[in-house]
From Swiss-Prot:
Quaternary data: Component of the ClpX-ClpP complex. Forms a hexameric ring that, in the presence of ATP, binds to fourteen ClpP subunits assembled into a disk-like structure with a central cavity, resembling the structure of eukaryotic proteasomes.
GO biological process: cell division; proteolysis involved in protein catabolic process
Single GO MF annotation: zinc ion binding
SS bond list: none
Binding site for Zn(2+): C13, C16, C35, C38
Domain ClpX-type ZB: residue ranges: 1-54
Keyword entries, A-Z: ATP-binding, Chaperone, Metal-binding, Nucleotide-binding, Zinc
InterPro entries named in the record: AAA+_ATPase, ATP-dep_Clp_protease_ClpX, ATPase_AAA_core, Clp_ATPase_C, Clp_protease_ATP-bd_su_ClpX, ClpX_bact, P-loop_NTPase, Znf_CppX_C4
Pfam families found in the cross-reference section: AAA_2, ClpB_D2-small, zf-C4_ClpX
A GO term from the CC aspect: HslUV protease complex
Native organism: Clavibacter michiganensis subsp. michiganensis (strain NCPPB 382)
Designated name of the protein: ATP-dependent Clp protease ATP-binding subunit ClpX
Similarity annotation: Belongs to the ClpX chaperone family.
Amino acid sequence: MARIGESADLLKCSFCGKSQKQVQQLIAGPGVYICDECVELCNEIIEERLAEASEETTGEFELPKPKEIFGFLDEYVIGQEAAKRALSVAVYNHYKRVRAVSTIGPAETVGDEIEIAKSNILLIGPTGCGKTYLAQTLAKRLNVPFAVADATALTEAGYVGEDVENILLKLIQAADYDVKRAETGIIYIDEVDKIARKAENPSITRDVSGEGVQQALLKILEGTVASVPPQGGRKHPHQEFIQVDTTNVLFIVAGAFAGLEDIISQRAGKKGIGFGAPLHRKDVNADVFGEVLPEDLHKFGLIPEFIGRLPVVTTVTQLDQRALMEILTKPRNALVRQYQRMFELDGVELEFEQGALESIADLAVLRQTGARGLRAILEEVLGPIMFDIPSDDEVGRVVITRESVVQNAAPTIVPRASMLRAEKSA
């Protein structure tokens, strides 16, 4: 019996190594022991981890005020003041609502008659005016998962193409498969005007990429628990699904809506017919877009249920030459600064004359490609010199002139030796 007592005294916690006599209680398992102190420590660690996870997934982040969001957008996006204001307020209200629901909890809101509905956003405006960039910048400021989807790739369930649930898979992937984090993210759906009904009156033929897609999007826009295939593609009954609640996902849908200005003008009585009809002007069209009503969107081809789930409607305007020049130089990550940084990595300075910047902006206006076309023009102008510079150690500075843009003339090259002599003489 003595031996049994001695062996009992030698029992130790498998985690901290303390003996049975040093702790209040020792819990035995199959070949292992754990003391009460280690159990308490484990509980504290678990509580801390759960608190951190709750903080990340329930919106307990620092929510910037609308003016702060607007200021951040102002650093990156030139112009579009009305759109930036509308987005700042809408995004602030959305995440304020998410935080309120997460803090109070759905169980405690049952008796409360006030339930704040979700306000998704519709962005209307021509291509290359910053619609996608606005949404990306918002997600960057809020540090939430962000996914971009193309509405033209979507089809109604059962037809060749992508199901609407694949949009949610992109958001889950952006959140590194953290579903809880994805459920408070932002989804940007572009080219939504391309899924407008092909005719104003419903047709007896199936419109699988138009009205059918709008119908399929209704539930996830409003808020539902969707079954998402983890590998994408079509659903089949024998696969497992990821369950995603879209109640707190903010949807920003956008499109160019070409021809919508005519519908608005006709409704408002601003458009003539025949030889007396006024010619289209971009500035006039921009003003007309600001007067859009739900009935105009319905006439364009969006179904009333779809319009009703997009209560915040804002517009972006065509960028003029002055705005394009500012985009080249003013934002924090301006295109000119990006290329100057790339040249610096090769030990070369890059300089643009004022005339060159004006010509680049003029070319973008002429091509009607907006801000998106600026990078393509810069690549055309800088491509040949970027090919030569890495192999030429004598180049110290490259100056882009108006002729470099307009006439494809070679830029002005300043040798490194000349720059050194100028520095010494100074």
